[in-house]
Structures are given as C-alpha cells and as structure tokens.
C-alpha cells in the first residue's frame, strides 16, 4: 500500500516546494523505494498552456502531451521517472470534470457543492493509479491562506482521516526571515502560518524551514513548542549553490530519516548518495567554462526557460565545464548590431517562443552564427527562424516569413492543419481554440544516417517532445537544401521537417522539438552535451 506525503507552503510563495518534493523523492529513491510525485495547482486555468510565460514560467510538456507546471520538470530531472497527464491537476480541470458529470446526470439530481463533490474529485486524483508505488508525494500549489487553495487543503485533510493510520504525513515549508535591524531570524511568520494550517484541521508532522543562515537551536526549540512539532522534525532548509545540492543538504539535515520515522519505518534502508555526490562534485569543480548567449523574448523571467537552463548545465556536467549564460533580449538586435553582443560568446542558442515580437532579432542571431561559424542551437521557434534566415540570405527569397506573423507571400513557416499521431490523423482549424490544440507530446523522427545529428544521437530513430502549432513548410525544402541547409530529420511520413543542419558549419543544428524536456543531470541530453562540447572548441578560437 502506498504512503502519502502532502507538502504545503506558507508565509510567501516561491519558497521551493517543487524542489523540496523532488529532493525528498530522490532521497527516498536512493533508499530503494518506488516514488511518484503529483502537483495540485489551485488556479482556474485548465492547464498552463495558454498562460503568459511571465505569469507562470515554463510550460513543461510530458510524453503523453500534457501541458503542465514547471515543477514536473524538477520531478523528472531529480527522479528520472517520466511524468504524465495524471501527475498534474488544476482547479480548472477539476471543475470541468465536475460540470461534465453534472451535465451527464452522474450526480442524480444532487446539488453540486465544493464539499463533497470538488473535494471528492481531488481525492480521487490523489489516490488513483498508485498501486505500483511505495510513496506518493503531493505538492499543493500556492500558499496556505490563499482562497483558491482551500478545496485542496480540505481534500488532503479528509484524506488524513480516511487513509489507514500511519500512511499520511504532512510537511509544511515555511520561511524564517532575517531582520538586519534586529540581527536575528524571526519565528513568528512560521508560527502564524502553522496556526492558519491547523485552523483548517491539518497539523504538520514536519516543518521544513527556509533560511539564509543557520537556525539557532533555541529557535528550533521555539518552533517545536509553538507549532506542536517534534524538535527533530524542525528541519532547516538553508540556501545552497545549486538545486542539485539540495538532496545532499536535506539528507544531512535528516529530512528523509524524519519522514520514514513519521511513517514508523525503522530500521530503514541506507541511502546510496554516490551519484548525487558525483554531480555536486562536478558542479563545484569544473575544469573550464564556456559562455552561451540565449537570445530569447521572455528573458525578463528566467523561469520561462527553466528546463533549457538545466539542460545547458547538464551539458556542462557531461563536459566537466561551467556554463555561463548571457541573456539577450532578441528585440535588441532589431535596433543594434548583434556583433558586439555575440563576438565573445562560445555558442548561441535561440529557444522556443510564440509571436512576431523579437523574431527579426532571432533571425539576425542565426545569420551571425552561420556567417561567423559560431555554434548555433535553434529549438522550435529557433529552428524556424534559422530556416527563414537561410531562405532570405541563401536562397534569395526576400519576403520569406512565417504565417504566424500575418499574411505572407512566402510562408517558409506555416500553420500545421493536420499530422499523424500514431495511426490517428490529427486536424486543426486556423480559427480553433488555443488551449491544448498544438502538436503536443512525444513524436517519432527519422534522421539521415550520414547527418551530424544522427551521429550525436547514435541512432536514426528518435522520440522527442513537441509543443508547436507552426512548422517549416515542406514546399521550400528542396530550395533550402540546394542552398546548403540539410533537412536531416523528418517525421516518419516525410511530411514534417524535424531537424536541420549545415554540413559546412562546425555545429549548426535546429530542431522542431524540445530536447531540454528530456535532459537529466545523470543523463544529459546528447544534443546539449554535444553543443557544449562544440562551445568548448569555439572557446579556444575566441
């Protein structure tokens, strides 16, 4: 039978519940347990697919095509277990399910209410499909006290009563702020947060307390006394250099031991921390460093590129170098010469994005990389802009553009209206809904055997995750290839271009998919490992 760990947050948002959940899952895995993590998001959107990156950050796409919270990316990177549609739920999805049931008459004329109908739907989500797991970790989004989170907190309160005794543990993540004028950390915000949590019927078993310095024993005793938590269960969560130091730090503080003790598991299997120690050692002892320019349009919020950032660091791990990121807003290149910004970097990456803003700047970045022989990695939109650049400057199609930006006589990039998903033909209308209508999830691509990208993968058959509505127009393939841009990867039916590259360039690759979503610290994605390797070679020339 699965045991459940419910993780809530208090005082302020963005304390790192997702990292805490992922780190705890990794620690339990290190002891040989089978672990699943689920995220419960209180917002009313059905999923984050149509939300602004500035509001939500990255949309993490799973193999089965779910558009989910970026925390699921942390879950995958820390545990290696691929997430799916059933690992993330939102209030919007809960309400949609309930309304559909009500319209079908499933409630037999009952008045549909938050309790029991909404809470039952949440509980069903938490409990479903856990037969093969020893532990299920559930992160509750938001902060205790948020009105949107109340149904979720009520649902996990009920689960604490309904599950067999000893199979549910509550962890509350809080903040102890340091007040310079007083010269001390303050416990009061945590006390009030726990008071709020207890007022709705949840008594935390463990306090995970964020702080920027060591928490004195006297403060831990104080929190234990006023929050009614064992002193050993007041665990400090200090700031660390990288997120991959968190599992080691939490293990040293005894988080995993305290969780197992709360479940009455004693003695517990000893953890194997060697691979985490190896990752930490490599991160803190690089043998060199490279600088990568990221030319994007959401650079004001780095969370919009969370998986991309981590995948670049994984590429650094594979090559034992530190990867420095130079963030450049693409629109800058529409006003200024790109050369002063890009001459000293060792690689240029143009990530995914939507819309016309910044597109010309990304095209200029691709042109600079092609002409100056600087390693270039174009992902999704970045591949599309590289193709438009080639069409304009190598083929001579001056009006080459994307239909995403408006009507154009030369749609080198166009809207996909149909594509194969397995044996099914997916169709989309230009005037259809935006949410959940893109080409989403894992799709197969076939690579040319003699291509650079096939050599990097060590295979001609790959499966990668996609999230796009527009695609390079196959009608321009022959002219682009004649100009030197090799279409090295295609969909199995030969209709959708998946990868492009230049044979006469040290490293210039564009991919329509998002390889960053499948990179792990222990298994860096081969494209990112190869890109950083090329950047190392470039660093010797700059």
From Swiss-Prot:
Q: Which NCBIfam families match?
A: PRK05380.1, PyrG
Q: What is this protein called?
A: CTP synthase
Q: Where does Mg(2+) bind?
A: 71, 139
Active site at: 380 (nucleophile), 514, 516
Q: Which residues bind UTP?
A: 13, 186-191, 222
Q: In which pathway does it act?
A: Pyrimidine metabolism; CTP biosynthesis via de novo pathway; CTP from UDP: step 2/2
Q: How does it assemble?
A: Homotetramer.
- More details: CTPSs have evolved a hybrid strategy for distinguishing between UTP and CTP. The overlapping regions of the product feedback inhibitory and substrate sites recognize a common feature in both compounds, the triphosphate moiety. To differentiate isosteric substrate and product pyrimidine rings, an additional pocket far from the expected kinase/ligase catalytic site, specifically recognizes the cytosine and ribose portions of the product inhibitor.
**PANTHER family cross-referenced by the UniProt entry:** CTP SYNTHASE, CTP SYNTHASE-RELATED
Instruction: Report any one BP term from Gene Ontology.
Output: 'de novo' CTP biosynthetic process
- Positions that bind CTP: 13, 146-148, 186-191, 222
* Start and end residues of each Glutamine amidotransferase type-1 domain: 291-541
Which of UniProt's keywords are assigned here? ATP-binding, Glutamine amidotransferase, Ligase, Magnesium, Metal-binding, Nucleotide-binding, Pyrimidine biosynthesis
Question: For L-glutamine, which residues are the binding ones?
Answer: 54, 353, 381-384, 404, 469
Q: What is its EC number?
A: 6.3.4.2
Show the PROSITE patterns listed in the entry.
Answer: GATASE_TYPE_1
Query: Record's superkingdom?
Result: Bacteria
Q: Which GO terms describe its molecular function?
A: ATP binding; CTP synthase activity; glutaminase activity; identical protein binding; metal ion binding
The gene is pyrG
Q: Which organism is it from?
A: Brucella abortus (strain S19)
Region named Amidoligase domain = 1-265
């Amino acid at each position: 039978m699965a045991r459940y760990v419910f993780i809530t947050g208090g005082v302020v948002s963005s304390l790192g519940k997702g990292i805490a959940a992922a780190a705890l899952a990794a620690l339990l895995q290190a002891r040989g347990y089978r672990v699943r993590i689920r995220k419960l998001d209180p917002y009313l959107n059905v999923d984050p697919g149509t939300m602004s990156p500035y509001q939500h950050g990255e949309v993490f796409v799973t193999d089965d095509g779910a558009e989910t919270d970026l925390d699921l990316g942390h879950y995958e990177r820390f545990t290696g277990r691929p997430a799916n549609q059933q690992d993330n739920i939102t209030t919007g999805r809960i309400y949609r399910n309930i309304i559909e049931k009500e319209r079908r008459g499933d409630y037999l004329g009952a008045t549909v209410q938050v309790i029991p109908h909404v809470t039952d739907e949440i509980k069903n989500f938490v409990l479903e499909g856990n037969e093969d797991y020893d532990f299920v970790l559930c992160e509750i989004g938001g902060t205790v006290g948020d009105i949107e989170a109340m149904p979720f907190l009520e649902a996990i309160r009920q689960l604490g009563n309904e599950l067999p005794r000893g199979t549910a543990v509550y962890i509350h993540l809080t903040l102890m702020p340091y007040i310079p004028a007083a010269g001390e950390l303050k416990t009061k915000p945590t006390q009030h947060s726990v008071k709020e949590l207890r007022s709705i019927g949840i008594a935390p078993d463990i306090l995970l307390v964020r702080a920027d310095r060591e928490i004195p024993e006297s403060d831990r005793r104080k929190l234990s006394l006023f929050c009614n938590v064992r002193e050993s269960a007041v665990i400090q969560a200090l700031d660390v250099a990288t997120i991959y130091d968190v599992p080691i730090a939490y293990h040293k503080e005894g988080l995993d031991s305290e969780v197992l003790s709360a479940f009455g598991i004693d003695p517990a299997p000893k953890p194997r921390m060697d691979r985490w120690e190896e990752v930490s050692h490599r991160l803190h002892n690089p043998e060199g460093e490279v600088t990568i320019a990221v030319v994007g349009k959401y650079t004001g919020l780095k969370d919009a590129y969370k998986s991309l950032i981590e995948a670049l660091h994984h590429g650094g791990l594979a090559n034992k170098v530190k990867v420095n990121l130079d963030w450049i807003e693409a629109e800058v290149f529409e006003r200024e010469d790109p050369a002063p910004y890009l001459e000293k970097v060792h690689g240029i990456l143009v990530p995914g994005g939507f819309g016309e803003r910044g597109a010309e700047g990304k095209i200029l970045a691709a042109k600079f990389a092609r002409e100056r022989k600087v390693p270039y990695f174009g992902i999704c939109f970045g591949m599309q802009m590289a193709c438009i650049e080639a069409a304009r400057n190598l083929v001579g199609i001056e009006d080459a553009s994307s239909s995403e930006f408006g009507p154009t006589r030369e749609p080198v990039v166009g809207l996909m209206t149909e594509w194969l998903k397995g044996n099914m033909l997916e169709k989309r209308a230009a005037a259809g809904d935006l949410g959940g209508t893109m080409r989403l999830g894992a799709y197969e691509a076939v690579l040319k055997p003699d291509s650079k990208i096939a050599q990097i993968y060590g295979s001609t058959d790959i499966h990668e995750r996609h999230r796009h509505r527009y695609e390079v127009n196959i009608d321009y393939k022959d002219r682009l290839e004649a100009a030197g841009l090799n279409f090295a990867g295609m969909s199995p039916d030969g209709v959708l271009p998946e990868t492009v590259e230049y044979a006469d360039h040290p490293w210039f690759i564009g991919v329509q998919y998002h390889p960053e979503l499948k990179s792990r610290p222990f298994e860096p994605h081969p494209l990112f490992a190869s890109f950083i390797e090329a950047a190392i070679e470039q660093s010797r020339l700059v």
